[in-house]
Amino acid sequence: MSRFFRRRKFCRFTAEGVKQIDYKDLETLKAYISETGKIVPSRITGTKAKYQRQLATAVKRARYLALLPYTDSHE
């Protein structure tokens, strides 16, 4: 018996019926990036493998076009 209620992971893209993840949709992409700028793994977010691959490609494209940072701001 666990002490804490763990929320069930689910794929947000499957639930919403998304066909393709857009690299220009920065609000969606920022939800899957840590504060240090790394892509959060699917075992933590619950994203299916198909959408995790699309997500990684979209984040890399957005980084290349300077829409997202590669790392956090070093202060």
Swiss-Prot record:
Q: Does the keyword Transit peptide apply?
A: no
InterPro entries annotated for this entry?
Ribosomal_bS18, Ribosomal_bS18_CS, Ribosomal_bS18_sf
Q: What's one GO BP annotation on this UniProt entry?
A: translation
> What family classification does the UniProt entry report for this protein?
Belongs to the bacterial ribosomal protein bS18 family.
| Coiled-coil portions | none
**One Gene Ontology MF term:** structural constituent of ribosome
* Biological source species: Teredinibacter turnerae (strain ATCC 39867 / T7901)
- Gene name tied to this protein: rpsR
This molecule's function is given as: Binds as a heterodimer with protein bS6 to the central domain of the 16S rRNA, where it helps stabilize the platform of the 30S subunit.
Subunit details:
Part of the 30S ribosomal subunit. Forms a tight heterodimer with protein bS6.
Pfam families this protein is in? Ribosomal_S18
Q: Name the keywords, alphabetized.
A: Ribonucleoprotein, Ribosomal protein, RNA-binding, rRNA-binding
State any GO CC term.
cytosolic small ribosomal subunit
**Gene3D superfamilies with a match to the protein in the record:** Ribosomal protein S18
Q: What is this protein called?
A: Small ribosomal subunit protein bS18
Has UniProt tagged this entry with the keyword Protease?
A: no
